[in-house]
Amino acid sequence: MSEQKKTVLITGGAMGQGRAHAVKYAQNGFNVVLADMLDPEDERFQETIKELNELGAEVLAVKANICSTPDMENLFAKAWEKFGRLDVVIANAGVINFGNTWELTDEQVEKVINIDLIGTWRTDKYATQYMLKQGFGRIINIASTSGLYGTPKLATYCMAKWGVLGLTKTLAKEVGSKGIIVNALCPTKVKTPMCET
């Protein structure tokens, strides 16, 4: 297995931070699995795929909703079938909304928690299952400095990212002895389409 080209799977991979991660891994010789809510035929998704192909990466692009168990089962099964290994999985997909804590609706809170926290858990779940089969792997959860310090008018995002950090620490302890390394990145504000909406 070590002689095969390595593979990275990235959720929210069509644009923004996901695309930046994909480009860096392609530059380092990885094949790339991109999962996104966008259809792979979308012009923005196609631009990313083209750039990765030009860097020499073989790309599998899959429309997948991280809030959907069937979608995520399908995503990981397709990735495994195509490449036969998952060296790195980056749980990058996420959303954000703004508002004072006391003004938020149930719907606003539940949407961010479902995508940013539960969607990350779902990504980690399937990543771990496949990595346990091969005996190694690295999972990287995209958290935020908001999950460390709190940020006014970002209560939902802060709650979710605090949860992601707890998930990361727990999973790292569960699988660290099994050859799987789990970490979180905590970037500050990044200029991406998510932050411009």
Protein language model regions, located:
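Canonical Rossmann dinucleotide-binding motif of NAD(H)/NADP(H)-dependent dehydrogenases/reductases
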Residues: S2-V33
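Active-site helix of classical SDR
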Residues: D124, A160, T168
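Active-site loop immediately N-terminal to the catalytic Tyr-X3-Lys motif
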Residues: W102, Y149-A155, S177-K178
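Residue(s) in the substrate-gating loop at a strand-loop-helix junction
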Residues: S144
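Substrate-binding pocket helix/loop in short-chain dehydrogenase/reductase
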Residues: N100-T101, T105-I113
